[in-house]
């Protein structure tokens, strides 16, 4: 049995250094963690409890919903609506802001989440995850409006993700570095196993969906072609290409051994300037990546500086090891 620092201990000790901390944030995070444990259990049991497969419904993104998309969204709501820490929630799976029911008190935070990132991988047993972000409510104790959620990523109080793989991990930042916790099922607690996570500045791995190559802009075409040319090309070294189709899995690999992840702007669907959701995926992951020493950009601007125009805005994403992201940025500026 692991006897290290639990997540609860870690957060309480961290809050002790913040003047005026009331414990609301710690309590909210504990509710999120309880939801993540519940989701982990549902994902791990999968077909045993009949939660695999797709439904005949689509989410606001126009994507066919998996059964687990709906189940995990409900888990996040039910575990976080009641305690009086939130003024509202927003989810990738819901068209509009989720208003806290009148029977519950309102708090000073907003919760934004993707309940099951990479859900297309569920039926084939590849790692999936949950992404979340905590913002301050502009008016504490008042029901949140859509406009309250449209804050740039620099305003995040906390961002994190859970990875449901060979073990369940929770990776978290509150703006003071990045730490990873592993769920010890014997004691039912997340235990600190990856303190002070840092992304190596250099890498020989890149992740991109190569089936979209014909739609990429020239800077990305150039970068990928040079990586593929390897030691015989202008980069003078060999690269490996990865693609899991799960942002949580991709970012976790980058946090542990370096790499660059790209879902760039393309011309496949001119109505969509990017594929990933700013509020539910790009902004939280960018906060984590930057806190771990990496960079995150659309190719044209820092993702954390973007103020969302709506709840489901999409953006291009290029993030990971600092030196490789700077190479791609240089090609965009050329």
UniProtKB/Swiss-Prot annotation:
Keyword 4Fe-4S: no
Binding locations of Mg(2+) 2: 114, 117, 281
Subcellular location, record wording: Cytoplasm
Cofactor field: Mg(2+)
Reaction(s) the record says it catalyses: beta-D-fructose 1,6-bisphosphate + H2O = beta-D-fructose 6-phosphate + phosphate
Superkingdom of origin organism: Bacteria
Cofactor, free-text remark: Binds 2 magnesium ions per subunit.
Cellular component terms per the entry's GO annotation: cytosol
Main location: cytoplasm
Residues at which substrate binds: 117-120, 209
Membership in a protein family: Belongs to the FBPase class 1 family.
Subunit text: Homotetramer.
NCBIfam families: PRK09293.1-1, PRK09293.1-3, PRK09293.1-4
Name the UniProt record assigns to this protein: Fructose-1,6-bisphosphatase class 1
Organism, as annotated: Nitrosomonas eutropha (strain DSM 101675 / C91 / Nm57)
UniProt lineage: Bacteria, Pseudomonadati, Pseudomonadota, Betaproteobacteria, Nitrosomonadales
């Amino acid at each position: 049995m692991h006897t290290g620092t639990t997540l609860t201990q870690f957060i309480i000790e961290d809050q002790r250094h913040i003047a005026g901390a009331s414990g609301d944030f710690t309590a909210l995070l504990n509710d999120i963690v309880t939801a993540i444990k519940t989701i982990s259990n549902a994902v791990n049991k999968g077909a045993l409890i009949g939660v695999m497969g797709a439904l005949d419904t689509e989410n606001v993104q126009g994507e066919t919903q998996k059964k687990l998309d709906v189940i995990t969204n409900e888990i996040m709501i039910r575990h976080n609506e009641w305690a009086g820490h939130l003024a509202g929630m927003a989810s990738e799976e819901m068209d509009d802001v989720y208003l806290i029911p009148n029977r519950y008190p309102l708090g000073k935070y907003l919760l934004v989440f993707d309940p099951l990132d990479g859900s297309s991988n569920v039926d084939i047993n590849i790692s999936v995850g949950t992404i979340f972000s905590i913002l301050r409510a502009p008016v504490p104790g008042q029901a949140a409006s859509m406009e309250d959620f449209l804050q740039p990523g620099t305003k995040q109080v906390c961002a994190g993700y859970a990875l449901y793989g060979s073990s369940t991990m929770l990776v978290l930042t509150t703006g003071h570095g990045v730490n990873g916790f592993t769920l010890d099922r014997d004691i039912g607690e997340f235990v600190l196993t990856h303190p002070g996570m840092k992304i190596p500045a250099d890498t020989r791995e890149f992740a991109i969906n190569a089936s979209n190559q014909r739609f990429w802009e020239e800077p990305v075409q150039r970068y990928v072609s040079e990586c593929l040319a390897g030691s015989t090309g202008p980069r003078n070294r060999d690269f490996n290409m990865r693609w899991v189709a799960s942002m949580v899995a991709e970012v976790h690999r980058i946090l542990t051994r370096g790499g660059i992840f790209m879902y760039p702007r393309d011309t496949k669907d001119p109505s969509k300037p990017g594929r990933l959701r700013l509020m539910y995926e790009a902004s939280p992951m960018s906060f984590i990546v930057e806190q771990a020493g990496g960079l995150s950009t659309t190719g044209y601007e820092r993702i954390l500086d973007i103020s969302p125009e709506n709840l489901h805005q999409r953006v291009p994403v290029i993030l990971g090891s600092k030196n490789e992201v700077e190479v791609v940025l240089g090609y965009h500026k050329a």
